[in-house]
């Protein structure tokens, strides 16, 4: 269905109006003609007569109907732009924001004011090759936003082909001269691109860390320090047998993870005490959740442990939840306190009702009351065995019974009930004095907390002693107070409680007397079953108290630190102008900040970088992430998100790696990689560089199997992993036996052979694999290196191990696997050789003295005869030689900066893997399509070679459309075999002679 708006506009256009006949609705045409008009309707027809654009603003004319298009224009005046459907004028759908800003190619202060060298970097030498387009240069903004620039990747500008370059030269030039000039042009073009890239990025931190003469040395020393620290940790683990006890197999994921975590803890400065945290993994979630509890819960725990004068008061008041909650709800450590507080209150109310009934029965008679007490005790024991509710009822029991008669009855009952009754008497006596001691407790709350912990530790020791003794002999617990072994502990407890509470000592003595009486009465009666059951609640009370104190000790006391567990934040957008110090300044405001890592920029991301900020595990990482998202650094959004923990730290690889032949090949490759990396960072060697080069040569000879290299391969290095490595590099085979018996491997090649594991070779390989992974951050089975791992949140986070082995494997598969793996590891096997001085001269290397001379000449200005000015200081001199002397004496730091700048640029040129913009796709594909161009050719006058679309993928067509005209045609992109061939004419009447065939 056609669009109604477009149909309406089509009918209103002047193009169709003029083609209609005069007899076609003349009356309607008269209505549209202005009253004051005397000419034809076509001459004075104005499509915008309803708007202010009509001549004279419409004054003096009749009132006409406003144009329908005026109501649909975005600005309210004038017609809608005539392209597309009016539905496209609706607000555009919100698209997802990418990981980096879209305006990175433009100068926008929102993203740090970073403006990559779009058009300002072209040299004046190439400006002469720019040609005008329609009276001026092509509009850069429109061209850069075209479809060819939809990709985020920046590229170099397209380089002229030989044919295009020939069009710029004189017609009488010779072929040799053309080739010479074209070679010079390509060399100058490459120099220009390198120079522009250096100028654009020389002030950025990542670029300085690579090539600046001072910053690069500082960075390399820092990395070497990291490697030396890692190597020392590896040697320590190798000597104590930790490395040798683990195999790099996916089936041993847990031991591998443990070894990696041990390395991380050691790298973080941990001790052997901190390594114990690896055995306490189930306790980590509880400790972490307790630290993020609300403030009220933490205050309740602190109040429960900071009242040593009345430790049982917490059981009767709000402290009951603190004691019982860890035991009742072990599966919900976070919400256990809040949930149990409500249940404890309900149980307290029920126990008070039971106590009232007990008081009424007591008046009936003493004997009946004792029977009821026994029934209540039995009922409470049953509840204790199910869900520990008798502790709550016993505590509320003692709270309700406060009369003196009940105290006497309790003393008589304690002759039959041993431990629990003594504790109840102690609780009752303490509750009577709680009100008097409350003010003193609040005043000495902070000072008494450490003493309370000491007391509870001694109570815990007593509890352990009681648990070791047999349960039927519960009377020994009461008699233990009088024994010499228990007397010092009791005296220490009383001494610790004396400064806290003066009345605590009489209570202890009274309790000991009661326990002694209970012991004497127990010798007479000996109710063996009942005291055995009664002792359980008392021990549980002590155990619950100890657990509550332990929760606080985990937080406050010296405990193993989980240094291998961290929390981190990922920064998606970091402009190249942002430095690491600026990020550290922001992160230092947050608690628990450890380090920050910034990745190298990528051309695909328009040189924006990514970052990882590491914090300790016990911080509120989401709150810190929220605060970072609310901050802007140099008007750049950081894009902070919470970084998840690693999901799978041990990942399997092909199981064929366990085969003996593959293992032997892997040992060779690992040894080569280890020696190359050790030589690059000068590890394990104290000799100068030539000795290291000689060592590398011997390593190569040993790998090839030469006898001379084999004797010196392992002994030329102090690396303990590479010593005596040549014993495992020589292959063995039963060649003579197979020849005599006439055996051949053809049958095995067809059917395959089973995987053969050589445990001795695998042990040697595993040491090399762990050395590369721990020291050099190289994951061999993943054939990659994890860069800047010492600054990342997870050090030694991921490792690839041998997976399950297949049943059989052919020799062809083994050879293909070894060959492909060696190709993937070429980046580590080949040494990085810097370019020589002769090589960098062709790339535009600079000379320090020449640049200093240029600097002096640039700062020597002649004002008049015998009057010269130095712009650096503003002083005037009589001659240029005085200015030269002045610059070298007074501005020596400026001269040094010039020399450093020259060395900076030359270091960039020496790197064979230097970063630079990728070549233009048109430049790389040009040789394939160049012969297919027609005679029409390409005229640079129609298209500026560098101006219009410097970073596009497809060259724009200058004049014509997609078909004819000069320029690049559509089928130019097709290969030769897919293009149309020239249709020739063949005369059928001509004789069958190929020489006379004429093709037109």
Swiss-Prot record:
The record's listing under PANTHER family reads: ARSENITE-RESISTANCE PROTEIN 2, SERRATE RNA EFFECTOR MOLECULE HOMOLOG
The terms describing its cellular component in GO are: nuclear body; nucleoplasm
Family per record: Belongs to the ARS2 family.
Which residue positions does Phosphotyrosine occur at? 83
- What is the scientific name of the source organism? Drosophila willistoni (Fruit fly)
Q: Please give the subunit comment from the record.
A: Interacts with cbp20, Dcr-2 and pasha.
Q: Which GO terms describe its biological process?
A: defense response to Gram-negative bacterium; negative regulation of viral genome replication; primary miRNA processing; regulatory ncRNA-mediated post-transcriptional gene silencing; siRNA processing
- Its domain of life reads Eukaryota
InterPro entries in the cross-refs: SE/Ars2, SERRATE/Ars2_C, SERRATE/Ars2_N
Q: Does the keyword NAD apply?
A: no
State its role.
Acts as a mediator between the cap-binding complex (CBC) and RNA-mediated gene silencing (RNAi). Involved in innate immunity via the short interfering RNAs (siRNAs) processing machinery by restricting the viral RNA production. Also involved microRNA (miRNA)-mediated silencing by contributing to the stability and delivery of primary miRNA transcripts to the primary miRNA processing complex containing drosha and pasha.
Positions carrying Phosphoserine are: 85, 336
Q: Where is this region: Disordered?
A: 1-104, 302-539, 691-713, 911-940
Q: Where in the cell is it found?
A: Nucleus
Basic and acidic residues compositional bias, start-end: 8-34, 342-369, 412-441, 448-478, 486-527
User: Where does the UniProt entry say this protein principally localizes?
Assistant: nucleus
Q: Where is the composition biased (Polar residues)?
A: 700-713
Bias (Basic residues) occurs at 370-384
Q: What is this protein called?
A: Serrate RNA effector molecule homolog
Query: Pfam family example for this protein?
Result: ARS2
Q: Which UniProt keywords apply?
A: Nucleus, Phosphoprotein, RNA-mediated gene silencing
